[in-house]
Amino acid sequence: THHHEDHAGGVRAYLAEGATLVTTAGNRAYFERIASARRTIAPDDLSAKPRRPVFEMVSKRRTFSDGERTVDLVDVGPSPHANEILVAYLPQERLVFQADLFGIGWGTPIPAANTTSVHFAKRLQELGLQVDRIAAVHGRTTTRAELEESLGKQVAATQ
């Protein structure tokens, strides 16, 4: 999704296996540094078999399909959280998978939206993404109605 370490921590294991890293151009230098970092105290698989990362860049949107199911990687940045940040959108399922843009914990009340969530909702609208469910890296899967409720609480708090 983006370059923060809690979302990119395992990338070296994938690179060691020869996986192609799909990201945005602005994140390339970060991932090149991660790939070239020396691990001498606790060598990992990439240290044992070093290789240069292979990149596939996403500029705005990249669609993957197997003929039955489609996944769109969409850059919803720049956002208050990261300049370039990808979401995975499954149009058939009306589902978006995102990291750090909107989240509600398990058994917690719906919070007032923060600036990042407000931006996320705006980008969903601008991009025409038809979303019913929002899967989160941190927190539970939520609904569009819960996002709207969160936005309503943010507006009410500012009045």
Q: What feature does the model see in each segment?
A:
Residues 1-22, 126-134:
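Active-site metal-binding motif and surrounding structural segment of the metallo-beta-lactamase
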Residues 25, 145-159:
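Binuclear metal-ion centers of metallo-dependent hydrolases, dominated by the metallo-beta-lactamase
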Residues 13-15, 36-37, 111-113, 148-151:
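Short, glycine/charged-enriched secondary-structure capping and boundary segments
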Residues 17, 26-149:
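Metallo-beta-lactamase
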Residues 23, 31, 98-99:
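Hydrophobic residues in well-ordered beta-strands that form the structural core
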Residues 2, 26, 138:
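Residues that line or immediately flank small-molecule/substrate-binding pockets and catalytic motifs
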Residues 4-8, 21-25, 110-118:
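Soluble non-cytosolic domains of exported or imported proteins
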